[in-house]
Curated annotation (Swiss-Prot):
Keyword Acyltransferase: no
Listed GO CC annotations: cytosol
PROSITE patterns hit by this protein: AMP_BINDING (PS00455)
Protein name: Zwittermicin A synthase ZmaJ
Family: Belongs to the ATP-dependent AMP-binding enzyme family.
Phylogenetic classification of the source organism: Bacteria, Bacillati, Bacillota, Bacilli, Bacillales
Example GO molecular function: ligase activity
Pathway in which this enzyme or protein is active: Antibiotic biosynthesis
Keywords of the record: Antibiotic biosynthesis, ATP-binding, Ligase, Nucleotide-binding
Organism field: Bacillus cereus
Record InterPro entries: AA_adenyl_dom, AMP-bd_C, AMP-bd_C_sf, AMP-binding, AMP-binding_CS, AMP-dep_synth/lig_dom
Top-level lineage group: Bacteria
């Protein structure tokens, strides 16, 4: 195994220097051009002190600068920290300080927005001249050095940083190439926001085999028409969806009959939510039977480097509701345990545990949480306790059976309900609160916040306050004021009762007293 991911890319540059590597709208970069630009940036960064385990932030829109910036950070020897320019300044500042990032690579228009609110040095990638030596730098990384740090939602009210090493990423990318080989004839669509780790394989898989990456225009990942147009005009062969977005995409194809426009598409990967049999059946009807496109279900937490299982979906009609998450990828082992940590046999539901080369180093500045989640299970086995319930079938495939805690996925985005609740509790006037998830349809999942207060609080005030700390995807769709929180016999908030209260008849801002509607005022969220 190579020591670092950038070395694999540099070896590919030697093989295919003049082949197109990156496509963004009407711009392209060849392998040689991308290598030279990222080398020029890397020299600048290394002269500034970037080296192994140095975390460098990158806050850009999807663009060619995004690719050059990430590759430049790695070539300098550092680890990249993706930051969303759409997140609140307070959240960004916490991540910057917590990670120890002293430098943020950005773009001019983003720099102007944040230069007064963020305490960090910022460098605009679109203002660099990219002159000087374009030759490769000496690789100064070991397999155990950090390659990236991605922050996920945290139950304590603050996001937590997951530290991934080069060896883990290389194992994941090399497995993907062995299992689903691609070549210079293939083009991967990069459409996942880079603050989520699915983007990592979209960012690097193509780069080690001579394929292309086509970068979808910012914000267009939610629009099927834009995905179809980009796929058609760039002969995209590989893409990823969250199941709920796949459902919306398939619905669009069914209504418009535009399946023939994406005949180049040969493989779709899904992850982030439970895949259902109806997704597979509709996919096969619209894409497999006509175009021969294949569907693969992936599963994995950020703490185990993107994905740890894969299940190739059948091309015939299936009737069972849930779809397996598959078998472990190479150099990964998985098993389920009971509440005492004892391994369970096949067919028994327990907590899913992961071991192997894909495990993260741990959480940034969270030694206690790292010790709780990353456990030395035996003398030679370190595991990550996922918090997911699962069982292993007799054929070796794993079935997902929900969560132990209050972590949820909404449109594929990982959310700790405790983080929302912690922020809501800090809002003046809120005495107690709880947030639940409601599945309204196959494509629509909503967050509903229940809060207890002496007086009613204006909806816009609640939303405005939460937006100071949380990204938009974590802002509840509905707020329900209750006179008194329902409690279980043990004194905990009874979320099952709240789930019954959070039905369609309650609008975006509703007041409940004793479980019945007291006052209701509807507003669009």
């Amino acid at each position: 195994m190579s020591t670092c991911i950038q070395k694999l890319f540099e070896e590919q540059v030697v093989r295919t220097p003049d082949e197109v590597a990156v496509i963004f709208k009407k711009e392209t970069l060849t392998y040689k051009e991308l290598n030279e630009k990222s080398n020029q940036l890397a020299r600048l960064l290394r002269e500034g002190g970037v080296g192994p385990d140095t975390v460098v932030g990158i806050m850009v829109e999807r663009s060619i600068e995004m690719v050059v910036g990430i590759f430049g950070i790695l070539k300098a020897g550092g680890a990249y920290l993706p930051l969303s320019p759409n997140h609140p300044s307070s959240r960004l500042q916490f991540i910057i300080e917590d990670s120890g990032a002293k430098l943020i690579l950005t773009q001019k228009q983003i720099l102007h927005r944040f230069q007064d609110s963020l305490k960090a040095d910022m460098l605009a990638l679109d203002s660099i001249s990219y002159e000087g030596k374009g030759e490769n730098l000496e690789c100064i990384n070991k397999p155990s050095d950090l390659v990236y740090v991605i922050y996920t939602s945290g139950s304590t009210g603050k996001p937590k940083g997951v530290m991934i090493e080069h060896s883990a990423l290389i194992n994941r990318i090399e497995w993907m190439q062995e299992a689903y080989p691609i070549s210079s004839k293939d083009t991967i669509l990069q459409k996942t926001p880079y603050t989520f780790d699915v983007s990592v394989w979209e960012m690097f898989w193509w780069a080690i085999v001579g394929a292309k990456v086509c970068i979808l225009a910012p914000g267009m990942e939610k629009f099927p028409q834009a995905i179809i147009e980009t796929t058609e005009s760039n002969d995209v062969t590989i893409m990823h969806f969250v199941p709920s977005m796949l459902s919306a995409f398939l619905h669009y194809l069914d209504v418009t009959g535009e399946t023939n426009r994406i005949k180049s598409l040969k493989q779709v990967f899904v992850s982030g939510e439970a895949l259902l049999s109806q997704h597979i059946n509709r996919f096969n009807k619209l894409l497999n039977f006509s175009n021969g496109t294949l569907l693969t279900n992936l599963y994995g937490p950020t703490e185990a480097t993107i994905d740890v299982t894969a299940y190739d979906c059948p091309t015939h009609e299936i009737t069972e509701g849930s779809v397996p998450i598959g078998r472990p990828i190479k150099n990964i082992e998985m098993f389920v345990v009971d509440k005492y940590g004892n391994k369970l046999p096949e067919g028994h539901i327990g907590e899913l545990c992961i071991s192997g080369i894909g495990l993260a180093r741990g959480y940034v500045n969270r030694p206690q949480l790292t010790a709780e989640k990353f456990v030395q299970y035996s003398l030679d086995t370190r595991i990550y306790k996922t918090g997911d319930l699962a069982l292993i079938r007799s054929d070796g495939n794993i079935e997902f059976h929900g969560r132990i805690d209050f972590q949820v996925k909404v449109n594929g985005l990982r959310i700790e309900l405790g983080e929302i609740e912690s922020c809501l509790m800090s809002c003046e006037g809120v005495l107690q609160c709880a947030v639940i998830v409601r599945q309204e349809s196959e494509m629509v999942v909503k967050l509903i916040a229940f809060y207890e207060s002496e007086n009613d609080i204006e909806l816009e005030r609640l939303k405005k306050y939460l937006r100071l700390f949380l990204p938009d995807y974590m802002i509840p769709n509905s707020f329900v004021r209750v006179n008194e929180m329902p409690l279980t016999d043990s004194g905990k908030i009874d979320r099952k009762v709240l789930a019954l209260l959070g039905s369609d008849k309650y609008s975006h801002h509703t007041t409940l007293v004793g479980g019945s509607v007291n006052e209701e005022s509807s507003k669009d969220s």
